[in-house]
């Protein structure tokens, strides 16, 4: 994309670039910024059973530095940040973009996209639990007597975090960037102060150590890779949050602060362990003097809360995209800011995440145990993104097949190796993220498939709208009574007479002066300009067909959109307008095309969906619902 194509990046002043880059430090890099708390410690464990050698320590740090370089810097910062959907990034944004050009393998792309989104939602459960636990565990070094209170303290912090979501975080969000920036600077300073413990650690910049270690260690080398991958967890946030900050601020923050700070800290941890092998039990916190431990624990806890907040917000945003793209049932979405429509709260998602996070903390109890389960969801999401990126460069950038293979195949192979290394931890809790991701994938696939079958079933009994209008406007003794005002009938199929219109005629025997057949569509792009918001077609003197178009990142506020429609010439008084909605009772059918259990599950999801009148922000006192029954 060009610089000007992104809303944040047109004519960007240095001060605006600085503040956006600072903001991205808190939101985009919060997750990856908490990895030093546990990544090196976990990577040491598989090879420390028979003592550590100098070569092993240097090789581990080398693996971490080159993982950050190849996966984060090359794949995400330099490449994927350019693969945007009109400024927006993330798995579902990429899927929406690819659906425009998919040829013959739409179902495969869709399943991949849903799996990527599901893995991200699983990550949104594990990240808060792991990061807060790992930060609070620093209290053991401050006061060993607090060891028994680590889990209760973590639960309280996480509970408060989820409770405040409904109030919005706009008031404190401005501090996220500066606090996280201080966190990175403190980590960098600690790393610098310990590199002098053994300057030999600087040999880790040589990739020879990383490659040689993997070749010589065999099985243990593969196991270690699973822990090494913890250094890049959070990289998906760079792409997912592209729309919030823009490409340049995210890149500047990475190269000027985040990447140097992470590298220096890992080098410092490595040098510390080389000089004092006994510090391998917790090299991150043992880098700091006793007097600094408590302040660092407090700062680490703040950083992990910010990282957790970022991933929770990302989950809310992804769910809204999923709803608008038709992958999830409608849910109640509350806006927590009057000025920023991106700040939302989804109560049902918040509740599910809260239950999941607390369950993980109480089940695993330590960051050591939880870290084993962490990598699978992240590596899985990265593999999915890489495969979809391959399709993107072929379809959107017109890369030849050989060029796409040469550029992306090494990344996919590397990430598959990381995924394989993490799959070795299935029996140690690695099954948890797989179960979570499977559950979310089943939900999204069931909803998508069920709504498609529902649409197909209703189409068989539909009456073409032009034929209906022609018949109803013929004057006869059986013509319905005409009443003043406007009736708006919501329908997903603008070519057919809406069920609500037919039921209204059948039961009430009336027809309004003006009848609007309204269809709401979601575009395969994040936002739609007001001049492109609607399309009006006059079918007859009394019937109009209107299509409202929203971006998948927008609130589908029909009342506001209709105000724009009035300015365009469709005259009606909102206070004398009635909205007619069809309410379908779905009954399972063994011959629906889905297994019976999936039929039942779809009905459960449909019954739990929020009302269309609430989701589309219709005036409550102007809505009429007419029921019908359909077998699916």
From Swiss-Prot:
Organism: Rhizobium etli (strain ATCC 51251 / DSM 11541 / JCM 21823 / NBRC 15573 / CFN 42)
GO cellular component labels: plasma membrane
Entry keyword annotation includes Transport: yes
Name the record gives this protein: Probable potassium transport system protein Kup 3
Gene: kup3
Domain of life, source organism: Bacteria
TM ranges: 17-37, 60-80, 106-126, 144-164, 175-195, 210-230, 254-274, 292-312, 344-364, 370-390, 401-421, 426-446
Coiled coil location: none
Cross-referenced InterPro entries: K+_transporter, K_trans_C, K_trans_N, Kup
The organism's taxonomic lineage, starting at the top: Bacteria, Pseudomonadati, Pseudomonadota, Alphaproteobacteria, Hyphomicrobiales
């Amino acid at each position: 994309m060009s610089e000007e194509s992104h809303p944040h990046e047109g004519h960007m002043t240095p001060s605006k670039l600085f503040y956006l880059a600072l903001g991205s430090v808190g939101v985009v890099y919060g997750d990856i910024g908490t990895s030093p708390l546990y990544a090196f410690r976990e990577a040491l464990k598989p090879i420390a059973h028979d003592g550590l050698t100098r070569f092993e320590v240097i090789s581990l740090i080398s693996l971490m530095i080159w993982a950050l370089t190849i996966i984060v810097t090359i794949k995400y910062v330099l490449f994927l940040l350019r693969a945007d959907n009109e400024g927006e990034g993330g798995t579902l944004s990429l899927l929406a973009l690819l659906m425009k050009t998919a040829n013959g393998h739409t179902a495969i792309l869709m399943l991949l996209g849903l799996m990527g989104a599901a893995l991200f939602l699983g990550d949104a459960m594990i990240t808060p639990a792991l990061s807060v636990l790992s930060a609070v565990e620093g209290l053991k070094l401050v006061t060993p007597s607090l060891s028994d209170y680590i889990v209760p303290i973590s639960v309280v912090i996480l509970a408060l975090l989820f409770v405040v979501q409904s109030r919005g975080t706009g008031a404190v969000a401005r501090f996220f960037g500066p606090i996280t920036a201080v966190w990175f600077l403190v980590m960098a300073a600690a790393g610098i102060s310990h590199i002098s413990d053994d300057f030999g650690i600087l040999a880790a910049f040589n990739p020879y150590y990383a490659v040689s270690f993997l070749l010589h260690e065999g099985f243990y080398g593969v196991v270690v890779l699973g822990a090494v991958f913890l250094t890049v967890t959070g990289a998906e946030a760079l792409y997912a949050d592209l729309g919030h900050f823009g490409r340049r601020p995210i890149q500047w923050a990475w190269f000027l602060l985040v990447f140097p700070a992470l590298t220096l800290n890992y080098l410092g941890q490595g040098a510390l362990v080389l000089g004092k092998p006994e510090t391998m039990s917790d090299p991150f916190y043992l880098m700091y003097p006793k007097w600094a431990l408590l302040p660092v624990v407090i700062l680490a806890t703040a950083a992990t809360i910010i990282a957790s907040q970022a991933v929770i917000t990302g989950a809310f945003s992804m769910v809204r995209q999923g709803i608008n793209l038709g992958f999830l049932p409608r849910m109640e979405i509350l806006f927590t800011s009057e000025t920023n429509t991106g700040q939302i709260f989804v109560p049902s998602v918040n509740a599910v995440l809260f239950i999941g996070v607390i369950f993980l903390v109480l089940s695993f109890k330590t960051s050591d145990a939880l870290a084993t389960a962490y990598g699978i969801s992240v590596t899985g999401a990265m593999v999915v993104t890489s495969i979809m990126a391959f399709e993107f460069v072929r379809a959107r950038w017109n890369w030849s097949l050989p060029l796409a293979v040469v550029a992306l195949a090494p990344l996919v192979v590397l990430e598959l190796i990381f995924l394989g290394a993490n799959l070795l931890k299935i029996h140690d809790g690695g099954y948890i993220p797989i179960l979570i991701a499977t559950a979310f994938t089943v939900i999204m696939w069931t909803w998508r498939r069920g709504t498609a079958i529902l649409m197909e079933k209703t189409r068989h009994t539909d009456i073409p709208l032009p034929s209906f209008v022609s018949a109803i406007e013929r004057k006869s003794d059986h013509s319905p009574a005409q009443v003043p005002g406007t009736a708006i009938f919501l329908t997903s199929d603008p070519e057919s007479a809406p069920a609500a219109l037919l039921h209204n005629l059948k039961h009430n025997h009336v027809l309004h002066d003006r009848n609007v057949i309204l269809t709401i569509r979601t575009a395969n792009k994040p936002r739609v300009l007001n001049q492109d918001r609607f399309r009006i077609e006059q079918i007859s003197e009394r019937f109009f067909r209107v299509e409202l178009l929203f971006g998948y990142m927008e609130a589908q506020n029909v009342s506001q959109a209709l105000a724009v429609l009035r300015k365009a010439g469709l005259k009606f008084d909102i206070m004398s307008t009635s909205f007619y909605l069809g309410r379908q009772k779905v009954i399972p059918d063994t011959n629906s095309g889905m297994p019976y259990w999936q039929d039942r599950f779809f009905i459960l999801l449909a019954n739990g969906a929020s009302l269309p009148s609430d989701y589309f922000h219709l005036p409550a006192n102007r809505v009429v619902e007419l029921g019908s029954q359909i077998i699916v």
